[in-house]
Design a protein with these regions (language model features):
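Surface-exposed molecular-recognition determinants
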Residues: 2-233
Length: 233
């Protein structure tokens, strides 16, 4: 059985309203985008059999990311992240540091969401899960991959505006999750956060090269977590 989350708090509704304003005309003369076209929070119950999650997000045509978390039931599973750039079988865990692994949790990205396999971590019978789906869209969300060089470099993105938040994971080996946020400090390009720990902000030029992101690129420094030579991110 699949159910969609329909109740939101006042704060969440205000956030959705602000997103709707951002997307008005964001397509650059094409169809107007609504928040429901590019983002979904969806609750479902596992059935230990293949099942589609029809949340209305076009992942097969536009690309994006699916983030799944076990909520309650007989087991405690971690966060499971899959995106269209790395492929449906490649998984990352946002609460830990390992490299990506090959798993059979999601079988396909679809024009109306995604489909689950019978894998227990994301679809165990009578267990409850939450999924968050982000579709690629200008001024909202993008997923990019790159190979590190060991020297400070820029990485292109397709947002068309300076990103407010950047999350980077080394997919080749175990490394912390690097986080940039424009409201983190007075000079956020000089600082970093780590997604998988509770550590406070750290000042270091090795992560963002003390360079603010732009509407077309962001900059990474020389730290292994963001730019090791020959490793993938």
């Amino acid at each position: 059985m699949v159910e969609q989350l329909t109740m939101v708090s006042l704060e969440e509704q205000l956030l959705l309203n602000s997103f709707e304003k951002v997307f008005m005309g964001a397509a650059g003369g094409g169809a107007t985008l609504d928040i429901t076209d590019v983002f979904s929070t969806y609750l479902y119950t596992g059935n230990s059999a293949s099942q589609p999650i029809n949340n209305g997000i076009d992942l097969s045509g536009e690309g994006g990311l699916v983030w799944i978390k076990w909520r309650s039931g007989n087991n405690a599973f971690g966060h499971s992240l899959h995106d269209t750039e790395r492929g449906v079988t490649k998984e990352l865990h946002s609460d830990s540091t390992p490299a990506q692994s090959t798993e059979d949790r999601i079988s396909s990205f679809n024009s109306t969401g995604f489909s689950l396999t019978s894998n227990t971590e994301t679809n165990l019978n009578a267990n409850y899960y939450a999924s968050w789906t982000f579709r690629k869209a200008p001024k909202f969300f993008d997923v990019v991959t790159y190979t590190g060089s060991g020297s400070a470099k820029t990485v292109a993105h397709s947002l068309g505006s300076a990103p407010g938040m950047i999350i980077i994971k080394n997919t080749s080996v175990a490394d912390p999750w690097a986080v940039y946020h424009r409201a983190n400090t007075a000079a956020p390009q000089t600082d970093y956060l780590v997604l998988n720990t509770s550590a406070a902000t750290v000042d270091s030029a090795a992560w963002w090269n003390d360079t603010a992101p732009t509407s077309s690129v962001f900059t990474v420094g020389t730290d292994h977590s963001v730019n090791a030579n020959g490793e993938n991110y």
